[in-house]
Amino acid sequence: ATLTAISYWHLSVSRAGYPNVLIPPVECLAAYYLLTGYRAGSRWRMALGGAFIGLVLWTYLAARLWPVTVALWALYTLIIEPRHTLSRWQGWVLAVLACLAVFAPLGAHFYLHPEDFLERAGQVLVFTQTPPAQIPALLGRNLLATLGGLVVQGDPRTTFNLPGRPTFMLWMAPFLFWGLARALRHWRRTELVLLPIWLLGMCLPAILTDDAMPQSQRMSGIMPAVFALVALGLDEAWRLLERCQPALKRWLPTGLVALLLIFDGAVAARDYFGVWARRSDVYIDEHGPYELVASRAVQELEAGRVPVVIAQHYKHPTSAYLLPRSLDAVWSVGDKTLPLPNRGGAEVIYLWPYNDSPLRQELRDRLFAMAQEEEPLHSPWGDEMVRVFRLAPDVLAAEAELSAHAAFGNELAVLDWSLDRTMPRTKPLRLLLHWRALAHPDAGRVLSLHIYDEQGLRWMEKTSLGYIPEQWQPGDTVYQLYELELPRGIPAGRYQARLLMSREGGLGAFPVVVAGEMTGSYVDLGWFTLTPEGGSIEAPHEASYEEMLPGVLRLIEHKAPPVSAHQGDTITTELLWQALATPEGDVDITLALLDANGRETWAQSYPLTPGYPTSQWQPQEVVQGRYALSLRDAPAGPYQLVLHVGAATRPLGEILIDAVERSFEEPPMDAAVDVLFGSEILLLGYSLPAAPYRAGDVLPLTLHWQAQVQPASDHKVFVHLVDATGAIVAQRDAAPVDWTRPTSGWLADEVVSDPQYLTLPSHLPAGEYQLLVGLYDAETLQRLSSAAGDDGRLALATVQVE
């Protein structure tokens, strides 16, 4: 117990706040009651020991090996003293039942939620993280590093240790080996042999993981055993001294052992409180800078200034706990955001714990250009921890004068952006966006950057919004950096950057407004070119597929088609190619559907990579191709999707195309309209019962459309209910037939009956209202023109609300 209490390891674990500190005491209770019950033949003691075995499983993942360790010891006792062990069978049974009873609630949870049991283990176990051929060597290295962590080189991580400090210093290490030798020498005393079994068994959680070694937090279960072994070694030394110096036996052994323990404890205290605790990296890891931030933020708030905290976490819990008022500061999250809050012209002070949240270079440059650095904040030991900047007085005024390029509704204005127009494929795509808040949002918002190719296929997207919407105030401006890793094998060519904003959850995209007019659902940030330089050059892949063009081109991966789709859908497939040599000419491919009889019923041809001809590929370059397949003309049924390249054919997967019920006859309807929208879609009429309605009712409106030609793009239907002043009191926007029949899948002359049920607000006053309908382009948001109205809205009917 003394060895444990004075050890650096136990001191560190007990103060770190991790649940693994609970493993050793619960293990000790389990071992004590199991051993004493086994020796005395006490069934209730063995049952209590089993209960503590079940309890330890509630503490930490590494504790899962404790029942295994106990089982190995029980097997050893059965081998060494079979009669005695079998005579205690009732106690063993009770121990197992008690263990299962205590573990049962947690076991039931794991049964219902197996991911909670497997996920973390799957992230670290060598069997899931390491190629099979490398596992034996890795386990050997882990074993040596784990055992070496006791006496040679300890855990390298400051969170769990003074980096490199072994569990036992040079003067204590010999007693560990001495105690281990004593336990093994008395191999028939099962209570002593439990200690080496315990040591090895509870080292397994560390040995079996693929991580930095040694892993002190995963081997905390060995504490009772390893300190008991050292105690055995000290006891042996004590006895030896008594035999060698019998005349001094009353004080010499006791005095020497006491001095050794005092010295070891003093060194541990010095290492922990005097060395480890004063390290700047420990101060940062333990969130010390946020104590400084909280104090300074409150000072600035009381002085009427606006503190901006640049942090890794929103409203950092350390600051919140110490000084709750620090939460009133402006918090910028992550290293890719720099807000300029405008609070009536109040001075802005930036508090930047730069070691914890290092701003990206583009934002550093902006901060240094716009603000003057002041005296930093220091740790209690004098280390610089938080940099402080004061925003120049004229910056906010200059920001307010900037004109907007576009706006998302009435909430966010895009001021400008910077994006390299030509870049190699060797580095991430970086875009610096400058925007202004126009309003305080009522909920969360998502601002995302999408990258499309010239065929309209999306290749990348990134969401970045370190300035949380609940902090937005009108006039705030923000510099926001987007950094996108390029996909493996992305072809050279031209790409378009699009900026979109939606409500949290990705629903409800905001319209883009330019000069008071809606222009679409995204802000076009322009086109850029990825040059051929920096392609993915890889060693030749083993031929999991045969070469599609012998000696020239190999398909190395493909994305299977969806299991099912509907007629009229567009699906995307991805193929990953490798050039074995530069093709002499440009290669085309064909994707086809084969029916159950192997007959080709549908096919489309494509350039292998439209914007990056194969004649420009480099030898061994890996290039990804993406292909959009329109199923508008594909017949329904089960098919196999196949790839044709020259004379070579490769199946890509099976797909079931579900039939869409199509009609070319006009259905019965309450009123005929015959109004053409655009040049493609005719509204034949509608069905709507004429009975009066009440607030909260649903209008059972059905619109009947007819395609005059095959529509070239997707359109959405809008239904507006307006009052006498023209104000919209209820509306619905959706693709036809509740999003299941996109207009791009319609055939010429096809008739589509489209239910567009509109819910009336519960507080809607009685009176007459007008029902307006129309179509708009799903991408540009532009309404299709109609002969019935200049604004693209057709007055359909009058609705009476009682």
Question: Where are the language model's segments positioned?
Answer:
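Short proline/glycine- and polar residue-rich coil/turn motifs
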Residues: 466-478, 517, 606-623, 734-752
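Membrane-proximal, lumen/periplasm-facing interface regions of secretory-pathway glyco-
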Residues: 249-305, 309-336, 399-408, 612, ...
